[in-house]
Every structure is written in structure tokens, then in C-alpha cells.
Amino acid sequence: MSDLAKGVIPEYKIYIMLSPVDLDKEEREATEKYMKRDDSTIIWQYAPGISDGSSLSAKNIEDVTGFRVSLQKDAREFTGIFADKKHELLDGLRGDYYGITTGNSAISPAVVITDKEAETLGYYKDTGDVSCAVKKMDGWTSVYTTIPCLPAQFFRNLLKENGKHIYSEDRNVVVLANDRYVAVNSAYGADTEIHLDSNY
């Protein structure tokens, strides 16, 4: 976050914020200036900005993510279920569980999305409250999951929606690539098809 506050990060189409729970005034201003622009998409997880350095509140999260939320003091399982509906971000995921699906994952406070202007993508498994949603903002798109550990397929769908190159449609294949090499790891050792981009 210090690089963001200094304005020294490159411009990206997609930003993934892995639950920066404590965002001070300078860091909040930097997200507005350097990230929320040029049709970018930002993925937020759990409770981004719940603390501004002096207080903990739902309003702090709303100011950062653009979503209306509520804080629930009762512990909730960090397990969600994706909505069973047609949406480009849910391709191959409709009705699937996500998050921490084994063991005890209860956490408090739980964050619930209450924004009526957002499009719901997922729910808490144990309560049915909204846990994942997307919202078009002024010049950018906000994607928020209050349950972390989104599956790779979700990110693949997001990249597709933003017109980015996808090397493999196989959910069991990991591809690492740059302009010099392509490395492929298949969980099951089966034949797979790799789509090379214009760099090769």
C-alpha cells in the first residue's frame, strides 16, 4: 500500500485487494486517484478499509468499496455459495461453494453486503446473506466478496470479461508465462490445450 500511496504502481486494468483492513487517509485518497479510473476493475476481499486508523465501521468499508454493508458480531463460517444464475463472472461456478470449505472457519465480525444497487453473485452458506456482488461505479467496476479465497475460475471469468488472454480453459491446469517461456502444470497429467498469445 505504501507504493500505491506514493503513486509508483503501474496502471492495471484489474486490481486485487487482499483485504487491506487498515487504510489511512493517504491510502484511501490514493485508491481514488490511481485505481478507481479508466474503466478499471477492483476486487475487494473480506473487510477492506474497516479501519481508518482511528475507528472500525461499516462506513469505512463503504467509502472504500462503494458497497453498502453491515457488520455482524455473531461469528459466521467463511463458506459461501455462488448464485445459481446466468452471469459472465459465474460461468462454470453457478451453485458452487467457495471460501474455506473444510474445518472451522468462523470469523467475527462478518461483513454482509446490503447494497440494493449491486448485483448479487454469492451468499453465505449458513445464513443466505449476500457475500459477493458486483457494482458499476463512475468510471470503474467494484467486485466485492466478504468471503476470501475466490476460486481460479472466478478470476478467469473476470479476465475474459475484460478482454484479457486466457491460456487454458482447463480448471485443473496452471500456466505461468512471460515473453520467454510457458510453463504448464496439470493436476491430473491429462492432455490439455494451451492458447498462445501474439508474443509467441
Where are these regions (language model features)?
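A short, well-structured beta->alpha microelement
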Residues: 1-8
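Conserved acidic residues
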Residues: 13
